[in-house]
């Protein structure tokens, strides 16, 4: 795996009682898994000391779009209530598929946390190593968290439209190829098929192996094979802003500069009849 932003289960087990470490459970149901009660899954068993980082609950509920970043002050209050301290080393994990931990990693970094790592292999890897789980909620004292939002981390639909029209940035779409190529319907109702004109398709699952990123050589080969240049600004997108963070994490691991996330993603673009799509029908 690529280790820049990752820690292993053995390392975390050794440091689990370190007061400068905080563990964050960021597992999340993907589209089509609406019947899952992820909060209950957390209560049924999580890494000892981990608080539950509910990406759905921590999104902007004033927006009709899913998983949009909340206001900085809203996020800061939520983190303080969870007991999260922004000056500690935060270790984020998901169920072990690397589906949602990168989104939590990106949110925390975008709101000013400097030390954030992802547990390679996630909860599944922890359990494979026969390490113990804890049941029930984790109650911590109020944390110290003052969100310092980085506006350079995210772009809006107008920025993406300009990049698509003027070719000023590469747009990478992390959705599966069948959705990108308009061969199947979107899992969310009411969205058109297709992709943003000029976008390149790098499905997030191709970057991942057993809950970790592939090696840097493998990542380079995948990006180069899809026509991505590291010398040009990059905008990452997906269905709702979650798996785009996997692509962003991979590019960060490769030290690629000037990468931003389109938070509205296809949930916004695909819902608007006034925006262009490819392939044309």
From Swiss-Prot:
It is an enzyme of class 2 (transferase). InterPro entries: Rhodanese-like_dom, Rhodanese-like_dom_sf, Thiosulphate_STrfase_CS, TST/MPST-like. Gene3D superfamilies: Rhodanese-like domain (3.40.250.10). Its main location: cytoplasm. Pfam families: Rhodanese (PF00581). Residues 238-244 are annotated as: Substrate specificity. This is 3-mercaptopyruvate sulfurtransferase. The lineage of its organism: Bacteria, Pseudomonadati, Pseudomonadota, Gammaproteobacteria, Enterobacterales.
């Amino acid at each position: 795996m690529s280790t820049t932003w990752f820690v292993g289960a053995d390392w975390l087990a050794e440091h689990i009682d370190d007061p400068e470490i905080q563990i964050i459970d960021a597992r999340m149901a993907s589209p089509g898994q609406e019947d899952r009660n992820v909060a209950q899954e957390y209560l049924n068993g999580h890494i000892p000391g981990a608080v539950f980082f509910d990406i759905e609950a921590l999104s902007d509920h004033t927006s009709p779009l899913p998983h949009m970043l909340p206001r900085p002050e809203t996020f800061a209050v939520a983190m303080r209530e969870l007991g999260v301290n922004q000056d500690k080393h935060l270790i984020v994990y998901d169920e072990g598929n690397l589906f949602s931990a990168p989104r939590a990693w990106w949110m925390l970094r975008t709101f000013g946390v400097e030390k954030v790592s992802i547990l390679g292999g996630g909860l599944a890897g922890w359990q494979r190593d026969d390490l113990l789980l804890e049941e029930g909620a984790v109650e911590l004292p109020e944390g110290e968290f003052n969100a310092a939002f980085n506006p350079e981390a995210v772009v809006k639909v107008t920025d993406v439209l300009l990049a698509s029209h003027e070719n000023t940035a590469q747009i990478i779409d992390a959705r599966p190829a069948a959705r990108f190529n308009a061969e199947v319907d979107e899992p969310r109702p009411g969205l058109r098929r297709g992709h943003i004109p000029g976008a390149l398709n790098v499905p997030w699952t191709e970057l991942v192996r057993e809950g970790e990123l592939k090696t840097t050589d493998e990542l380079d080969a995948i990006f180069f094979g899809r026509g991505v240049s590291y010398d040009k600004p990059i905008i990452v997108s997906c269905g709702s802003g979650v798996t785009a963070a996997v692509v962003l994490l991979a590019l960060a691991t490769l030290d690629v500069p000037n990468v931003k996330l389109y938070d509205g993603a296809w949930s916004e673009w695909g819902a608007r009849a006034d925006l262009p799509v490819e392939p044309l029908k």
